[in-house]
Design a protein with these regions (language model features):
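Catalytic machinery of carbohydrate-active enzymes
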Residues: 1-353
């Protein structure tokens, strides 16, 4: 069985999609699964043992480019795929498998993709509340499985592979001290400060952890570098040597390895949060206006802190510097209590194993 998956274009969604690959591979161990996704996804896909090959999608996120998609599809015919799974909901994402003449093309209806998909699923959001459940459902017969509660349990959550040698080599390359365990902070989030725990709370937490013998690694893209600098500048001067701002300094590949090296991770609702969960790191996930009811961190070692309910489509908070009040109200003391509980549980698990 040869399978082509048209993968998502967001870090968090790409991570959650691994649950589908794991489910397909568990059902058919000899299945060959290729994933077509933006080239930046390769560092994630290469660490998913279920994926045979990461195929770069050369077209931009919003580009239709019908002729190029036809060319791509026809070029894939020689690979002889038996099935395709289309994870994005867009019309254009279903074109390549259609032009590749793949016999069975599975996906949710999305943008009215009748004809393009011939194993079409109509989404009942109440029956399939979690994104990961919607992905996994595609592996099963739509007549037999009509709601998430019918899926075999437990779901196979995302699980990335990183070697111990990679962790040590990469940590040394970025100047992390071997004698202090690392706590990772992911202080960024898409769409502005409303989804971010305030930098001054991160700084207060960092100070507590540094005083307790840890070092801090700040992760994120180049646009998160300023937030990292704000955290650093708020620390006591003698503590700054134990906090490393890696935002914008690491490629995604290196960030994955470094997150795997962390003793634990504190994160806003972001793609890096989902990566940390897939690396099985003790994780405290901080939510405000966005909701964990749809895309929670998929890990037994994750704890979510959220002080409000429901989903609030807010890109800029009402408080100073654009933060959301519900995130301001999460105190560093609450976070460190949750973190210490997680670290204690993780230590007990390590002793038992």
């Amino acid at each position: 069985m040869k399978i082509l998956v048209i993968g998502p274009s967001w870090v968090g969604d790409m991570m959650m999609s691994q649950s589908l690959y794991r489910t397909l591979k568990a059902a058919e161990p000899d299945a060959v699964i290729d994933v077509m996704a933006p080239a930046w996804c390769r560092p994630l896909l290469s660490r998913m043992p279920e994926v045979n090959e990461a195929l770069a999608m050369p077209l931009g996120h919003g580009a239709l480019e019908l002729g190029e998609r036809r060319r791509l599809g026809k070029a894939l015919r020689s690979k002889g795929y038996d099935r395709a799974y289309v994870l994005p909901n867009s019309f254009k994402s279903a074109l390549v498998p259609f032009f590749a003449d793949i016999k069975t093309r599975t996906g949710w209806r999305g943008e009215m993709r009748y004809g393009l998909l011939n194993d079409l699923r109509v989404l009942d959001k109440a029956a399939w509340p979690l994104m990961v459940e919607r992905y996994v459902a595609l592996a099963y017969d739509k007549q037999r499985f009509t709601r998430a509660s019918q899926l075999p349990q437990p779901l196979l959550w995302p699980k990335l592979q990183v070697s111990e040698q990679e962790k040590l080599t990469t940590a040394a390359r970025f100047g992390l001290a071997a004698e202090r365990p690392v706590i990772g902070f992911c202080p960024g989030a898409e769409f502005g400060p409303a989804k971010r725990w305030p930098h001054y709370h991160y700084a207060a937490l960092a100070q507590l952890l540094i005083d307790d013998g840890y070092q801090i690694a700040l992760f994120g893209s180049a646009k998160d570098k300023e937030t990292g600098e704000q955290i650093l500048e708020t620390l006591q001067p003698h503590s700054r040597e134990h906090c490393r701002n890696l935002a914008g300094e690491t490629q995604l590949e290196q960030a994955v390895i470094m997150l795997a090296h962390c003793r634990a991770v504190i994160s806003n609702d972001s793609g890096l949060m989902h990566i940390a969960a897939a690396l099985d790191r003790p994780l405290v996930a901080l939510y405000g206006p966005s909701s964990p009811d749809f895309t929670p961190p998929l890990s037994d070692k994750a704890r979510v802190i959220r002080l409000i309910t429901g989903y609030h489509k807010v890109r800029k908070g009402e408080a100073e510097e654009g933060y959301h009040q519900s995130l301001i109200d999460i105190t560093p003391a609450r976070v460190i209590t949750e973190l210490n509980t997680l670290l204690g549980e993780n230590q007990e698990d390590a002793c038992r194993s």
